Amino acid sequence: MVTGIESFKEWFKGNESQYAIIGGTACDILMTEEGLDFRATKDIDLVLIIEAVDVAFGRKFWDYVKQAGYEHCNKSSGVPQFYRFSRPTSNRYPAMIELFTRKLDAIQLPDDAVLTPLPMDEDISSLSAILLDDDYYEFLKQGKVTVDGVTVLDAAYLIPFKAKAWMDLMDRKEAGEHVDSKNIKKHKNDVFRLTELIDPTVKIATPSGVYEDMQKFVDRMKNETVDVKQLGLVGRTKEQILQEIGELYAIQ
């Protein structure tokens, strides 16, 4: 279980429609619900649903930040807007919260809020670009589910975000940019682990942009090395899993 998720759940009870947790924490919550283990993760990646967020949510969120006593409070410039809160005073709170919003100043913070500028790293930059894509944002809203009182992106909807992030980081690396290979491997492995939670008989209605990206991912992954046994995926080959992924999504 992610450290601090219980206090987050208690504090934001009643706000389930206003956010969605994605990334490693979402994977951890979904896997835990099914009795499966997941890699250690310490940060909560939070996407605001801008159509549902109001002033009251902004105040409530900042009150949580203050109560947790986060030592570092950072904010990016531009759109999408990104906030990072880290180093709380107690492990009752998440070690880090990373919050994304497509709308500039969607959260109206109080005048006494002190936020320092935040440089964009490769993972943030990649996710920010994905969330600016209308197809992916609509897909995210479509895939929200509540698990044990917390809103997360369901596994079948989380897979395309992980796949897209993997392709984006691979493209950057091939273009000569410095990219942490651990991030590339993380997204790739998460896609395959999440398939453990998928019903192969289900079809997911998918915006055309997301559908096309998933077909590209399947095609590109055919030439990649994936140790399915090391990932704990028993009884399925890489080829079988890729076929399942390719057949999971259908254009809306």
Question: Where do the model's predicted regions map?
Answer:
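Compositionally biased terminal segments of proteins
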Residues: 1-252
